Design a protein with these regions (language model features):
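A short glycine-rich, Lys/Arg-flanked "PGG" loop and its adjoining helix->strand segment in the class I
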Residues: 593-609, 634
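Hydrophobic beta-strand segment of the Class I
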Residues: 527-528
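Nucleic-acid modification enzymes, centered on SAM-dependent nucleic-acid methyltransferases
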Residues: 13-147, 157, 161-520, 539-585, ...
Length: 659
């Protein structure tokens, strides 16, 4: 009865209030162009503080939010006061001449919305002030409130705040919440002081890291390594062979002007397999791979046996899969190129020293062992589980664990230094959190699922994490390369600068289940969200890679967020056919629809009768769309418009197959 009453109230209000601009038109071509350009940005954007998945372009969210707040001038119920004010505001841009008709004003508003989707214009004071004035003209009696119960990385609440609104962001994931609190609360609250402390802290961490870890990351023939090249190994099961096969799936590692490749050879008598890294102007013919389709091919010519993928899995599950260090990538000058080389005795000795040092750390610190469970029950998105990976700790070598653990110790030392120097508890916590997120942003490169091809690539593939036969180990101390703390701190500093340009501190961040929001009835003017994508993005599992380190870095500063073994799974709204085997409860399509309906119904409860809901959904499957629309309608919303916006850059993974 309550839902029926709400729906009746919605229908009545829908007839009384003017349509919003987004309900009659939207400059989708211009918004899409800006969105694709924004996706190509490599620095100077809030999302470079830390990795997150399925992120929406902030400029597109800004444009959609603005078009949702503003009434459509061509609607006869649009207030005359808005017509007058909007015309005056847009006259600054030459978009609305005196005496313009309502149709002309609407066209001018659409042009403004389309241009304001440009990421760079978000920091332009003239555009920002005009957008805020337009929102104020649409809401002359109060500051509108927008809320996003699936806030993720914060594009929607961040851009609502940029428009001058009271913005509310909530999520369940602690990694997302740390990003939200840092970008949308700590940065605007502390301003330049946080940026200054962050820069000082980055210098402190870099200096201490070099001092404490430098011996484990030595130069190679006088040059700084960017990365080391590794291959997993299995035993050839060919008759009478038994050679140790290094699994090389990528025989060419750099196709740039100075090319690099791998030459593999084997000796019949000794059963020894040699790997050499070569470099030159032309890639020779006849290079071989030893891994393909999950199978292992023996490179000894007299053998050539293919160990079937099922047997490779058996060896992995039995703990018989090894790792072999075979190459090193060197920095030449200031980004003047790269040099590729075989490893030498010192490379191997340094790694061995790190392994011994890590063993000492592990014995002296009960929390050093990373025993948290890897999602091995999901062979679809996390294929390493098929090869014996059982904990998140299995994804890190001893040297990588030592480096990350040491960086955490340095962060704790800097926290103590901040307090000693007179910083407030709040500022010290916010600064260390931003630094910890920066270090955490190297974790996707600092594991044995990351791979090297012209440069370090992180471990995630699509929306999962696939097994890597040959992988790269990034040098965390080297300057200006992905996987290192220098690059991570630079990216984070630029992200903080970009967030400062939002120039609004009225964002509230809370941890909440989208189906049970701690917000009063009829309290928000806009419900704008990007809900979970049915069966595509396992956010919680993906974020656990960083979570296990963040809780070791700053768990003492955020005991409310970082007090569980792993990120919460049972309450996430997702379709996962393997959830029952993993003990996290049913996550079927039927359950997804039920819980999504609950979330939308809760959104409807919080939304004012004259409020507007806006849902972003980027799934390519019709079944997922049908389920989402059914949930929206079941929750009592009236669907008045739908717009296709292309937010993906053409070069992204799977772009040619996505809707």
């Amino acid at each position: 009865l309550k839902l029926a009453s709400q729906i009746e109230k919605i229908n009545t209000m829908h007839e009384l209030y003017p349509k919003r601009l987004i309900e009659v038109d939207l400059p989708i071509k211009r918004i899409s162009e800006h969105a694709q350009n924004e996706k190509n940005l490599r620095s100077g954007h809030p999302w470079h503080l830390h990795i997150w998945w399925a992120r929406r372009p902030w400029g597109a969210c800004r444009a959609v939010a603005l078009a949702s707040f503003l009434p459509a001038p061509t609607d006869e119920r649009c207030p005359e006061s808005f017509i007058v004010k909007a015309s005056a505001i847009l006259s600054v841009f030459g978009l609305s001449p005196n005496g313009a008709t309502r149709e002309q004003l609407q066209d001018s508003l659409l042009k403004f919305v389309g241009e304001y989707a440009c990421w760079e214009l978000g920091a332009n004071a003239t555009f920002r002030d005009a957008a805020r004035q337009l929102v104020q003209a649409a809401y002359p009696e109060h500051t509108p409130t927008a809320f996003d119960p699936f806030a993720g990385y914060g594009a929607i609440p961040g851009e609502a705040a940029r428009l001058g609104c009271d913005s509310i962001a909530s999520d369940l994931n602690p990694v997302a919440l740390l990003c939200l609190q840092t970008l949308l609360v700590a940065v605007p609250k502390n301003g330049q002081e946080l940026l200054d402390r962050f820069r000082e802290g980055a210098d402190f961490v870099r200096f201490e890291a070099e001092k404490r870890l430098g011996a484990y990351y030595p130069k190679h023939k006088g040059k700084h390594p960017i990365a080391w090249l590794w291959a997993r190994t299995v035993t050839c099961e060919g008759p009478g062979c038994g050679a140790e096969i290094p699994l090389i799936a990528q025989e060419v590692i750099d196709r740039a002007e100075t090319k690099a490749w791998i030459k593999i050879s084997g000796d019949k008598k000794t059963k020894d397999v040699q790997i050499h890294v070569k470099q030159g102007m032309a890639i020779p013919a006849g290079l071989i791979k030893t891994a393909g389709g999950g199978h292992a091919v023996c490179p000894i010519p007299e053998c050539g046996f293919t160990t079937h993928k099922t047997r490779v899995k058996v060896q992995g599950m039995a703990g018989k899969m090894g790792n072999r260090l075979y190459g090193v990538v060197l920095a030449v000058g200031q980004r003047q190129g790269k040099e590729y080389s075989d490893t030498n005795d010192e490379d191997i000795a340094a790694y061995t020293r790190a392994a011994v040092a890590w063993e000492r750390v592990r014995k002296n610190n009960s929390s050093a062992d990373i025993t948290e469970k890897y999602p091995y029950h999901d062979p679809r998105a996390f294929t390493a589980g098929n090869y014996g990976i059982r904990t998140w700790g299995d994804l890190f070598s001893p040297r990588q664990k030592l480096a990350l653990w040491t960086l955490g110790e340095i962060l704790r030392d800097y926290h103590a230094q901040l307090l000693k120097d007179g910083a407030s508890e709040s500022l010290a916590r916010d600064t260390i959190t931003a630094l910890a997120l920066s270090v955490s942003n190297t974790v996707p490169f600092q594991n044995n699922m990351a791979w090297y091809s012209r440069g370090m690539n992180y471990c995630y593939k699509g929306m999962g994490m696939s097994m890597k036969w040959d992988y790269g180990e990034a040098n965390p101390l080297v300057s200006d390369y992905a996987g290192g703390i220098h690059f991570a701190f630079h990216q984070a500093e630029e992200a903080i600068r970009a967030t400062l340009a939002i120039n609004n501190s009225s964002t509230s961040v809370m941890r909440a289940n989208a189906a049970e929001l701690p917000l009063p009835d009829d309290s928000a003017d806009m419900f704008f969200s990007d809900p979970p994508y049915y069966d595509v993005v396992p956010y919680a599992d993906l974020s656990d890679l960083c979570y296990v380190w963040l809780k070791r870095f700053i768990g003492h500063l955020h005991p409310d967020l970082l007090n569980e073994m792993l990120t919460p799974k049972a309450e996430q709204i997702l379709v996962n056919p393997y959830s029952m085997a993993d003990g996290r409860g049913e996550q079927s399509p039927e359950r997804y629809r039920e819980r999504m309906t609950q979330a939308f119904r809760e959104g409807r409860r919080v939304l004012k009768p004259d409020g507007i809901g806006c849902i972003v959904f980027a799934h390519k499957g019709t079944g997922a769309w049908e389920t989402l629309l059914a949930s929206i309608i079941d929750a009592g919303f009236i669907v008045t418009a739908s717009w296709p916006i292309d937010t993906e850059r053409a070069a992204r993974m799977r772009a040619n197959k996505s809707a």
